[in-house]
């Protein structure tokens, strides 16, 4: 294989999966086949999409009810020749799912890139090992927290929040994805002020914290804004990838003048991936494609919290981010939304040590503030790695957190 193989979930009311698959393969490549003269068929054969796999799935009554018709469901795979497209994500997505995405009854499940095609993508600049080297933390999950309620607040408020989170033992603090360039907390001022706070905490407490600042602006201004952030001392760039496009992420990741990790936020991705019947699968969108395009971190809804993904999907995202691949470094999985210390044993069980535990309200909502919230998480992480049940840990911050949010791991065998 020198091109790409697309895997689709299809629904067909004519109950002929073979015909539907062939129509897709032709429609996204040469357009027609059987009515072409023999000579033209020979000329176009190397450009034709080829159906290589068809499996019928069991009938699904909920699907029939939703679509208001009886359909046959199936998984199909089509191989698209590399000759047909340039080696970039806009061309690949348009080839494999462009006008097909308008069908409304087809879901792009996966894309399998040939080695020849993979060579055209950067992958993460730092990856898991590189991020761990920056923090000098190699033996546990990382802990990340989020600035909360920053809109309409000034730099002084940001500095106080940042200091408390860092003292609490948080490894990474990220901007809220809805904090854009503004007069109260402009980009470079956030970075410079944040660096001062974090350096002070490091000198006093010996704990290093990185700050992920939100990279925003018009698309053609992003590189300039990113370079300004780097010059000001940015540790990490948070980026709302799907508001801009995967190719924009790749462009940032490939730029040698932007030598910092990139953290991909999933904002807007639900518009592409939320339906089970159409769109693009979450594992492909938030896992494989983000990694290939250069994300060092991928945030996605956890299977436990307030905006939950199904566990199978969340684990599939993580698999794509972390599986061995000779072409790409591994990206950090960041299962997010509604996370509190009681979920730490589940996160470590399901995602392993190479994960970023990301919390907002679970840190800021602690009775002892963000310092207490961070310490509760760090204690929960340490106890989990020692296989110690959280309810047996003698720690006031963790105990307070479990009283507020509960301890689901106490009720479930891990």
Swiss-Prot record:
<feature type="binding site">
    <location>
        <position position="177"/>
    </location>
    <ligand>
        <name>Mg(2+)</name>
    </ligand>
</feature>
<keyword id="KW-0460">Magnesium</keyword>
<dbReference type="InterPro" id="IPR033966">
    <property type="entry name" value="RuBisCO"/>
</dbReference>
<dbReference type="GO" id="GO:0043715">
    <property type="term" value="F:2,3-diketo-5-methylthiopentyl-1-phosphate enolase activity"/>
</dbReference>
<feature type="active site" description="Proton acceptor">
    <location>
        <position position="99"/>
    </location>
</feature>
<dbReference type="GO" id="GO:0015977">
    <property type="term" value="P:carbon fixation"/>
</dbReference>
<dbReference type="Pfam" id="PF00016">
    <property type="entry name" value="RuBisCO_large"/>
</dbReference>
<dbReference type="GO" id="GO:0000287">
    <property type="term" value="F:magnesium ion binding"/>
</dbReference>
<comment type="pathway">
    <text>Amino-acid biosynthesis; L-methionine biosynthesis via salvage pathway; L-methionine from S-methyl-5-thio-alpha-D-ribose 1-phosphate: step 3/6.</text>
</comment>
<dbReference type="InterPro" id="IPR000685">
    <property type="entry name" value="RuBisCO_lsu_C"/>
</dbReference>
<comment type="similarity">
    <text>Belongs to the RuBisCO large chain family. Type IV subfamily.</text>
</comment>
<keyword id="KW-0413">Isomerase</keyword>
<feature type="binding site">
    <location>
        <begin position="360"/>
        <end position="361"/>
    </location>
    <ligand>
        <name>substrate</name>
    </ligand>
</feature>
<dbReference type="InterPro" id="IPR036376">
    <property type="entry name" value="RuBisCO_lsu_C_sf"/>
</dbReference>
<feature type="binding site">
    <location>
        <position position="176"/>
    </location>
    <ligand>
        <name>Mg(2+)</name>
    </ligand>
</feature>
<keyword id="KW-0479">Metal-binding</keyword>
<protein>
    <recommendedName>
        <fullName>2,3-diketo-5-methylthiopentyl-1-phosphate enolase</fullName>
        <ecNumber>5.3.2.5</ecNumber>
    </recommendedName>
</protein>
<feature type="modified residue" description="N6-carboxylysine">
    <location>
        <position position="174"/>
    </location>
</feature>
<dbReference type="InterPro" id="IPR017443">
    <property type="entry name" value="RuBisCO_lsu_fd_N"/>
</dbReference>
<feature type="binding site" description="via carbamate group">
    <location>
        <position position="174"/>
    </location>
    <ligand>
        <name>Mg(2+)</name>
    </ligand>
</feature>
<dbReference type="GO" id="GO:0016984">
    <property type="term" value="F:ribulose-bisphosphate carboxylase activity"/>
</dbReference>
<keyword id="KW-0486">Methionine biosynthesis</keyword>
<feature type="binding site">
    <location>
        <position position="148"/>
    </location>
    <ligand>
        <name>substrate</name>
    </ligand>
</feature>
<dbReference type="InterPro" id="IPR036422">
    <property type="entry name" value="RuBisCO_lsu_N_sf"/>
</dbReference>
<dbReference type="Pfam" id="PF02788">
    <property type="entry name" value="RuBisCO_large_N"/>
</dbReference>
<keyword id="KW-0028">Amino-acid biosynthesis</keyword>
<comment type="function">
    <text>Catalyzes the enolization of 2,3-diketo-5-methylthiopentyl-1-phosphate (DK-MTP-1-P) into 2-hydroxy-3-keto-5-methylthiopentenyl-1-phosphate (HK-MTPenyl-1-P).</text>
</comment>
<comment type="subunit">
    <text>Homodimer.</text>
</comment>
<dbReference type="GO" id="GO:0019509">
    <property type="term" value="P:L-methionine salvage from methylthioadenosine"/>
</dbReference>
<feature type="binding site">
    <location>
        <position position="338"/>
    </location>
    <ligand>
        <name>substrate</name>
    </ligand>
</feature>
<dbReference type="InterPro" id="IPR017717">
    <property type="entry name" value="Diketo-Methiopentyl-P_enolase"/>
</dbReference>
<feature type="binding site">
    <location>
        <position position="265"/>
    </location>
    <ligand>
        <name>substrate</name>
    </ligand>
</feature>
<feature type="binding site">
    <location>
        <begin position="174"/>
        <end position="177"/>
    </location>
    <ligand>
        <name>substrate</name>
    </ligand>
</feature>
């Amino acid at each position: 294989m020198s091109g790409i193989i697309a895997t689709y979930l299809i629904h067909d009311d004519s109950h002929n999966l073979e015909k539907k698959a062939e129509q897709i393969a032709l429609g996204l490549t040469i357009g027609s086949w059987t009515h072409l003269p023999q000579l033209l068929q020979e000329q176009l054969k190397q450009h034709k999409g080829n159906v290589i796999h068809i499996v019928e799935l069991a009938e699904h009554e909920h699907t029939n009810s939703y679509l208001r018709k009886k359909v046959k469901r199936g998984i199909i795979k089509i191989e698209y020749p590399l000759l047909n497209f340039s080696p970039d994500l806009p061309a690949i997505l348009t080839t494999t799912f462009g006008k097909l995405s308008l069908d409304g009854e087809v879901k792009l499940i996966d894309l399998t890139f040939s080695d020849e095609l993979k060579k055209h993508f950067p992958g993460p600049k730092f990856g898991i090992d590189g991020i761990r080297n920056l923090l000098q933390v190699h033996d546990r999950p990382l802990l990340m927290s989020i600035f909360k309620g920053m809109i309409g607040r000034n730099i002084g408020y940001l500095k106080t929040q940042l200091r408390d989170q860092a003292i609490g033992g948080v490894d990474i603090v990220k901007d809220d994805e809805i904090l854009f360039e503004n007069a109260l907390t402009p980009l470079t001022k956030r970075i410079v002020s944040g660096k001062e706070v974090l350096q002070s905490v490091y000198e006093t407490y010996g704990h290093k914290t990185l700050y992920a600042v939100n990279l925003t602006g018009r698309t053609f201004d992003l590189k300039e804004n990113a370079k300004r952030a780097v010059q000001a001392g940015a540790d990490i760039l948070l980026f709302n990838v799907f508001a801009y496009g995967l190719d924009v992420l790749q462009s940032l990741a490939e730029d040698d003048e932007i030598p910092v990790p990139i953290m991909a936020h999933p904002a807007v991705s639900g518009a592409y991936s939320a339906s089970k019947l159409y769109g693009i699968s979450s594992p492909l969108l938030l896992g494989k494609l983000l990694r290939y395009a250069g994300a060092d971190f991928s945030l996605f809804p956890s299977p436990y919290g307030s905006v939950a993904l199904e566990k199978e999907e969340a684990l599939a995202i993580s698999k794509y981010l972390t599986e061995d691949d000779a072409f790409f470094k591994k990206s950090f999985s960041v299962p997010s939304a509604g996370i509190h210390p009681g979920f730490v044993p589940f996160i470590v069980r399901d995602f392993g040590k190479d994960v970023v535990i990301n919390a907002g309200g679970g840190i800021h909502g602690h009775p002892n503030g963000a310092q207490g919230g961070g310490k509760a998480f760090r204690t929960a992480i340490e106890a989990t790695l020692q296989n110690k049940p959280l309810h047996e840990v003698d720690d006031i911050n963790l105990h307070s957190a479990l009283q507020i949010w509960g301890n689901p791991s106490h009720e479930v065998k891990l």
